[in-house]
């Protein structure tokens, strides 16, 4: 005779739906100055996010010459604002497409960054394009040296452009970070007492978590910039860093134009 299965007295509930992502955009803005390309891109962002059910907050850090301290202060501002699920660093010299950022949110990664060129011209890349006989209109694409350290792509820069790619390090100039990422990283980083003017204009004595710093990487003995340091600490915490190859970014900078008449052969 089959035994009747006892009914569980513990009520079951459907899983709670995940809240819509809400973005807190942070910009270190030395001198309080931003490029027109950044401003033009930023203006398009709120409406694009709202069309996808996302709200947006914003904070900028003026006149902080020490970039790692500026980024730490911006994270310190973000953390108590529990309504925001993601912090998005966008530097004031970056040109971006808001739709690319939406796709970065949808990728659902702990850390994902856009790939942008350094403020230098990769003349070697241009020469290689000329030697290969590439069309003149494509030479511009070869001028950039990218702010990225690829993982498992040591001998190639060919990656799938429509999906996230795992990297060792990426620049923080266009980086999306989940709130949970900071919580997971906290045991792996230090804290310090703030002794400078804070974002609201006051002098705060708050204890600030040092997610960003410059340090020497064990093993390689490389001096890490604040963004590569952040990625290193994230990997120590068991997290992965991803790049968004689909993000089309510009990095605005000044350039000294030089030239003159050449002597006759």
Residue ranges and their predicted role:
Residues 50, 105, 235:
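Anion (oxyanion) recognition and catalysis
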Residues 1-65, 69:
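N-proximal low-complexity "stem/linker" segments adjacent to membrane-targeting elements
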Residues 75, 97-214:
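Conserved catalytic core of nucleotide-sugar-dependent glycosyltransferases
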Residues 72-86:
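Active-site nucleotide-sugar/metal-binding loop of Leloir-type enzymes
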Residues 2-24, 187-265:
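C-terminal catalytic/acceptor-binding lobe
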Residues 67-71, 139, 227:
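Conserved donor sugar-nucleotide recognition element shared by glycan-biosynthetic enzymes
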Residues 55, 93, 110, 240-242, ...:
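Residue-level detector of anion-binding/catalytic polar loops
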Residues 83-95:
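Short beta-strand-to-loop acidic/aromatic patch adjacent to the donor-nucleotide binding site
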């Amino acid at each position: 005779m089959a035994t009747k299965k006892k009914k569980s007295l513990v009520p079951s509930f459907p899983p709670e739906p995940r809240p819509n992502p809400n973005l807190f955009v942070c910009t270190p803005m030395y001198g309080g100055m931003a490029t027109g390309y950044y401003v033009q891109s930023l203006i398009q962002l709120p409406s694009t996010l709202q069309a996808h059910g996302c709200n947006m907050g914003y904070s900028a850090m003026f006149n902080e010459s020490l970039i790692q301290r500026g980024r730490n202060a911006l994270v310190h501002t973000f953390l108590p604002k529990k309504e925001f699920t993601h912090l998005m660093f966008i530097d004031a010299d970056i040109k971006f497409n808001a739709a690319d950022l939406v796709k970065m949110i949808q990728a659902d990664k702990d850390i994902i960054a856009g790939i942008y060129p350094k403020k230098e011209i990769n003349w070697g890349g241009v020469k290689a394009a000329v030697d290969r006989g590439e069309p003149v209109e494509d030479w511009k694409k070869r001028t950039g040296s990218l702010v990225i350290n690829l993982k498992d792509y040591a001998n190639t820069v060919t990656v799938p452009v429509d999906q996230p790619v795992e990297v060792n390090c990426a620049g923080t100039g266009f980086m999306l970070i989940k709130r949970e990422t900071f919580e997971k990283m906290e045991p792996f980083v230090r804290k310090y007492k703030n002794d400078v003017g804070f974002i609201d204009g006051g002098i705060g004595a708050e204890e600030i978590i040092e997610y960003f710093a410059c340090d020497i990487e064990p093993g390689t003995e490389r001096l890490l910039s604040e963004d590569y340091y952040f990625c290193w600490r994230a990997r120590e915490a068991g997290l992965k860093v991803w790049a968004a190859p689909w993000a089309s970014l510009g990095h605005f900078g000044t350039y000294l134009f030089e030239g003159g008449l050449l002597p006759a052969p």
